Amino acid sequence: YNHLPPICEKLGIKEPEFYLEMNPMPNAHTSGDTRVFIVVTSGLVEMMDDEELDAILAHECGHILCRHVVYNMVANYLKMGLDALGILGSVAKPVEYALLYWSRKAELSCDRCGSIITSPEVVARSMARLAGGPKSITNKINMQEWALQADNYDQIKNDGLWNKTLQFAATIGLTHPFSAVRVREILKWGESPQYKNLMQNLKAEASGKKCPKCNKRTWCKKVLKK
């Protein structure tokens, strides 16, 4: 539990209810409407080290920060409404596929929250742990090579109509992107000016630096360069 409050404070969100599910399968999820809560399984806690657990909790907090829980609830109600009205086929399925596409993009946003609290490398490591199991195996994974699989996948899926069709069929029902894609995207973002500037700004904010002009805690570039 002690991992959660500092993460919520850094992200500027109200601390949600937090539950431990006795389940050997490693997993975490965020849910609720008026009372938002995070659930982690005992299998996840046993598998992850402290940094990896922080990355996963920050990912779940990202769903709260970005209001994914509310949007997902509205989307599910919309889908249930279409089903209840008997609206199928040409209307309901495109709506469902659009929601799943949004869900995959939302996961990438939350991976960024995890990297802000820890680092892109820790986020990638936590994904390796979830995908491959114990440290004796996952510590040997070359993250750059794993991310390269996503590039190879992109080349294949863009090579002709048939491959595009296969890719569409393979991903259309997924709520999460493929792990290799998530690793590539978070490592790529970790090299971006946006991420580096953001981390500089957060570091300056945490140190209490103030702008010499307005005497306020700020993300002023002049202050950050000192």
Which role fits each region the language model picked out?
Residues Y1-Y71:
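Peri-catalytic and regulatory segments of divalent metal-dependent proteins
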Residues T41, A98, A170:
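Conserved short-loop catalytic and cofactor-binding motifs
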Residues A131-G132, S136-P212:
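Pan-zinc metallopeptidase signature
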Residues M48-E52, I56, V69-M73, G86, ...:
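Charged, alpha-helix-enriched surfaces in structured cytosolic catalytic cores
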Residues Y1, I7-I13, L88-I156:
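Short helix/loop segments within enzyme catalytic domains
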Residues C211-C214, K226:
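Short cysteine-rich clusters marking metal-coordination/redox-active sites
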Residues H68-Y97:
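Post-HEXXH active-site segment of zinc metalloproteases
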Residues K216-K221:
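Short functional micro-motifs and their immediate structural scaffolds
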